[in-house]
Amino acid sequence: MGANLVYGAFYKHDEPKKLLKYLYDHLDKDAIEIDTINFSGPLFENVDNRLMSLQLVKNGMTEAVMFNPSGNNILPARELYKKNILALRGSFRPVTKVNIDMFEKSLEVFLKEREVNENKTVVIFEITLSNLTSQGEIDEKDFMDRAKLLCSLGHVVMISNFKEYYRLVDYLSQYTKKQMALAMGVNSFVEVFDENYYTDLSGGILEAFGKMFYNNLKVYLYPTKDADGNIITSNNLKLHPRMKDFYKFFKYNGKVVDIFDFEPKYLDIFSRKILQQINNLSLIHI
């Protein structure tokens, strides 16, 4: 890889994306992982390292990358080692009041956990590659807009290839055995119990949940409204009959915690509707 890096620096410095691909020339991607990269110097003044991080995940060079509120790429091992971790997954397209309320209220609950020290806590906003490619090809401007907005909230942003939640937890567990929590809405939580997501695992959903909940993990559940306007929480959510007893095990063992101090008016906010309104306004101005 060192020889490839020297070659790329000399001959592909004006094409950073191609330079990245040349790093694996005649190398197997399974043999080595690049989990962070930073371009600096006069020749790379116009290169945004967040976009280069995105390329690492997109090209299968690593499973996840992280950058700090300043937009600088950071090593996951250094940032997460022996830390308490609160993670929020979303498309954040756009960031809505629901996202902010879920973040703020779940953080309040997390910091009240018995063994959580605020000074040793990391909050992660995670966007999966599938969320970035939901419209087809990745729109780099759209990605940068989301990244900058999330960075402005003062916490770490992660881009990952972890479609399933258990893979995210499994990844984070490499670096810490401290308290971890996932903040999510009821609808996302119900999807976690869909067995179709785990057909590639020999142990199926049991194996996935074993990986997800074996550590000090809790799920902070943000409520939603059903079609009749009823508020849905962990106490009245609907699951497939086969999953009910399975769910009760985690519920009664304190692994699922409701966020009660939420803003009821925010439950009528849906990011897709907001995005549609933004797009409609853009078309009017055009």
Segments from the language model and where they lie:
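Nucleotidyltransferase catalytic core that binds NTPs
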Residues: 1-284
